[in-house]
Swiss-Prot record:
PROSITE patterns: 4FE4S_MOW_BIS_MGD, MOLYBDOPTERIN_PROK_1. Its cofactor is [4Fe-4S] cluster; Mo-bis(molybdopterin guanine dinucleotide). This is Nitrate reductase. It is an enzyme of class 1 (oxidoreductase). It comes from Klebsiella oxytoca. Its EC number is 1.7.-.-. Binds 1 [4Fe-4S] cluster. Binds 1 molybdenum-bis(molybdopterin guanine dinucleotide) (Mo-bis-MGD) cofactor per subunit. Keywords: 4Fe-4S, Iron, Iron-sulfur, Metal-binding, Molybdenum, Nitrate assimilation, Oxidoreductase.
Amino acid sequence: MTETRTTCPYCGVGCGVIASRAPHGQVSVRGDEQHPANFGRLCVKGAALGETVGLEGRMLFPEVDGERATWPQALAAAGSRLREIIDRHGPQAVAFYASGQLLTEDYYAANKLMKGFIGAANIDTNSRLCMSSAVTGYKRALGADVVPCSYEDVENSDLVVLVGSNAAWAHPVLYQRLAQAKRDNPQMRVVVIDPRRTATCDIADRHLALAPGSDGGLFVGLLNAIAASGAISDDFNDAQRALTIAQDWDLDKVAQFCGLPRQQIADFYREFIAAPRAITLYTMGINQSASGSDKCNAIINVHLACGKYGRPGCGPFSLTGQPNAMGGREVGGLATMLAAHMNFEPDDLRRLARFWGSERLAQTPGLTGVELFAAIGRGEVKAVWIMGTNPVVSLPDSHAVSEALARCPLVIISDVVADTDTGRFAHIRFPALAWGEKSGTVTNSERRISRQRAFMPPPGEARADWWIVARVAEALGFGSAFAWQHPHEVFSEHAALSGYENDGQRAFDIGGLADLSREAWDALEPVRWPVSRSEAAWSVHKGWHRDGKLRMVPVAPQPTRATTDAFYPLILNSGRIRDQWHTMTRTGAVPRLMQHINEPVVEVAPADAQRYHLLEGELARVRSPKGVMVAKVTIGDGQRPGSLFVPMHWNNQFARQGRVNNLLAAVTDPHSGQPESKQTAVAIATWLPAWKGELFSRQPVPLPASLHWRRRAAQGIIHLSLAGDTRSRDWLVEWCQRQGWQMQVAEGGKVWNLLAWRAGELMLGWWSDASEPAIDADWIHAAFRVPPQNAARRHALLSGRKGGVEMPRGRIICSCFSVGERAIGEAIAGGCRTPGALGGKLKCGTNCGSCIPELKALLAAKLAQA
């Protein structure tokens, strides 16, 4: 058994993990008790990492035009085709689209090639979709992209405000640290500002369920209240302009704008002003807005104005969504940045040209994410290299992105997964290393750099992203500038650039790490930057503007760009769920992570369910002017009337019409370019199909285009849930006949079941009824492993249920131990009255703790019924 200290590849908390690999290859993961981000804690996704390292579905060799190729062939094809486009159309016709999943070394290589040697700044990243407004907010206020807070500040604050953040699900380990800090300090107060009542509200002393998109008005009103209280410092540039705008935002105006009772707002304002220490945690609910940058600055303004900044337990804390979004920001992996916190200014341009030894350096900012794919659609960008991300799923207006890629003359992808919604458009495909195989560094939300270490050999012909970029650079004729042989060399160059001609003028500086030996780099302990060679003082109090001052940015709150009408009367919000990550290429392969929420759902308030005749558990079509999706209805009091919520994760690999981004328009913030993903006007209507069914098969089945399907996680077989309006199953019978399989059919009323066999081996099973068929999926899975050996058992299998089978477990609440609602309900009825008692009896909530808010909700509901 070998053990390797590394980091989790999911959210921006940046947890340390210890990966243990057995001689036969099995991997298990536990939290690293020495890592300062998590001190041994893990969420359910992190705890399941050992179940994601298999090679099923992996891209393991290069391809060119759909045919397997050698590495020399694929690299030569990429180099020659890129060179032809550059020579004919210029460097602006080329673009890279990268990912917060990349390691810093990979990011650095890509940024250097695009900006430094191809000569255009058209390199952007999926981080544009999650935190570019936060970057803009920090740069406008502080003069640099500096996150001025730490996790210890969260634990040591008197008042923690979470706005636009469901940290319990999206940043679960940081949430657990906050929950523990609140238990240790009962005087700590927690305020959650969110239109939805989420799991994060479990520890909230106050929940402000404001109108979607109205956060800016709430914080501008708070600035006015701070000024009125006299607790204000105006020693900042533009302070008077910001205060002048805020003066119009009295309690009545804020209450009307936010849809909140006046007293709730007044109480929150008094609490914030009175708290000796206050910290505000904000994330996608703030950033993903057409006015996200202004909302970020409204938050920063109140912290500056009342002195709750630059000291322990205080500050505006943007939580990043991805494991290395921060690393991408540090290297300059956004089209609006240059490199190492340098900008497109004459001194910085000359400095970077000297360091890189390049005469081709891009001189102006490039195309941001939404702009980039629009330019591809117009034919202006003729080559795009997509690295470690799935923009057909993650960008707004998915259909337009697909159409753009379909028309693009050259699409290159580097990825670990063979089949994605984006990958089907690729002309050249490079197999990249995945977590556990690649080695480098990442930076978490609190500026902490950690090593991500390899503990498995590269599979097939997969290679590191930095290596792929360097070899393509070589094919383009720039090999001498990319002659790295090890990721340590890339990191050293990146670190050296951060300290180059930097005597305290630039905030980002890790020049003190530039001379690490390979052994020292490999053993690098987690460290927060700066790590400078310079003796210049560094402080979050410092303003990084030329005058050295901080700024309060004047903010005029704007209503959401999405407006409802008679045709689209509801506002749609999209976001993360507890057990899935991004587009599910990793987490979707783990059966236990698919138990909690296993298909696209739409959360609806009870009043809206009644108004639009929606039924719990039934399917509904959600429409916008851009498209349509299908999801299962979930009715709950946590949803604000007039609003819907849909998870962002599902895509064409997991469901037909399951992509929420089909519905989103490409509306962006004018300052940051970040899309508005939280507010879209939609309509909803129940869809009652003629039948529903379950399909299990050993091999892919070609489904008619008219069928709606959702893929379930299953090991060794394919499991689909289906629904349709056409009752004919002739297509399935004919397909099974072509395979030469023997069939058993049971038909009666609206029930139609089929088993298909080959030499005694179960190949396919189909169960359908007017409503969801009552089957025992676990028993069916077992029948594929060990087929029933007599006619009676086969007949029972054809019914889908064995005799005496227990009632279904209900929806899984605890994914760690597969504990369902039924068992929890029985334990409550048997006398369990606390989450601790439930954990003692069933183990639920005793591992990662992510399910504890739901355990509390079930306890409250069951005890209220008693």
